[in-house]
Amino acid sequence: MGRLTKRVINQVKKTKSHKKKKQTMKKKIFKTRLLSFAAFCGLTLAFASCANEDVAQNPNNTDNDKNLTTFTAGDPSTRTSMESDGKFFWEAGDKIWVKDDDGTWQQSSNAPTVKTASFKFKVPGKFTQSSTYKVYYPGQNGNQNQVTIPANQWQLKPNTTTHFGTSGDCGMADASKQSNGSFAFALDHKAAYLLLLPRTSNTILHDCYLTKVEINSDNDITSTYTLDPVTGKLTGTGTGKQIVLETKGYGTYVNGFPLTNNSTSAATNGSYVVIKPGTHTLKIRYWVKDVATGTEGTITKTLASASYDQNKYYNITANLNVKEYDGDHYYMWDAQEQYWKGYEWYNGGSQPTLRQGLTGATTSNDYAQSNTDPRYWNEAFTYGADNKATHTPCKDLPNVNEMTWYAAKGEPRWDGDELWTTMGHLYRGGVWFKKKAYISGFNPNTAEDGTDWRTNFNGNSWSVSQTLPNAADAGNYFYLPVLGYYQSGQLRDIDRYGCYWSSSAAPSSSFEAYSLNFDKHYVNLYTYNARFEGRRVGGFE
């Protein structure tokens, strides 16, 4: 009795001590789940349990089923779900499989109907011709030695693994005959497990909820696999590279798991995912929702390639901090100062912070209206020449030729879910472009069509893919949000269009310059952009 209590307490201590470590990823070994079963008909194993811990199912009953063998599971570390205090339990619907003396697959004829600390599985067939038998636990969605790790998993409250049985948890064991005629075995898990631990110090996110977590891999992590007794592993190659864990339940968790924690807290939002073991590059998208406004989107984290071994789980911490874009990077073309210099919104100035047309949107006349103002656009122009910017920051932007490479060969991909903030408001939407280092032929002197757009009037439009970068090459892309632009003292088209100046003015008009513009469908690159508009500068990689 004392040893059992001590074992549970030690597990609690280990769990708490691990939570305190500030590692991005840390692996833990699952306790093996010890099971034992009677060797012959009607034989029942007796075991002790503490009244306040493990209560055996029907402890005073005798097994009288002459055609059934009793598989008794009673050790605290044998069960298929784990609570945060270190106790393990069998869940409703759990069953085991064993091949009998005739080589026929036999499934336990009964299963727990409720969460229980111990259970006596009854299995048909004879088990008298061998001193060892292979035991299989394929999970509740599995069959015999076939395991299904589903692409959709559900967890109804934080820090619980009760969903493991339907999420692909599985294991095998060699059952060995004991001196008392019983068989005993220790079940080894064959899946890998992620414990996702998001936190945030962003006060905007403290009022939001985690509604789901999307795990994307560069190779398969979800499919139907085989418990292979020869290799002792899950075998088979699937095609599923994405798992979505839904984190909305009932009552307190009807909106999802809270994000109120500044530090890691499994009790607040700990989320468990079952995946196929292997070496994976994971891109994790945390779906966050502001229930007050209905805004829902993602915060993306990409992990380096790592090995995720069977029978282990990995703490994956994530500091969820929505990318913030300031309001200071809107400029008239090649101006010396930003559009709202001296009138910034964060200093109580008149800079509009809401898109025109929304309730509360404003108009300000405090923008530059003459060339004596350093915020005014560069008026220099020579027809047919390379009219390039001469002031920081515009002079350091990609020129129009380079912009064509981003648009035509940068594989622009729309992301309507990635969350970001600017000037105190939450938005989503933008385009992923390949970094120039990954664009073959990238050339500042020649556009992608072989001409020089700096001195020749030109323009074009390209389609935007609706497919996100995959996990394998996500690091090859950079993100530009749809931050809109300023015109006549009004903020326009934020959360609809991205408008980014190049360093090249038009070769055919003294009032225009090249700007890379995009929405969810197209990327446009034309000269029809008035130099006096306040467009974004920077952000290209």
For each predicted feature, which ranges?
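Sec-type signal peptide cleavage vicinity
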Residues: 2-7, 15-408, 414-416, 420-422, ...
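C-terminal, surface-exposed recognition/capping segments
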Residues: 417-541
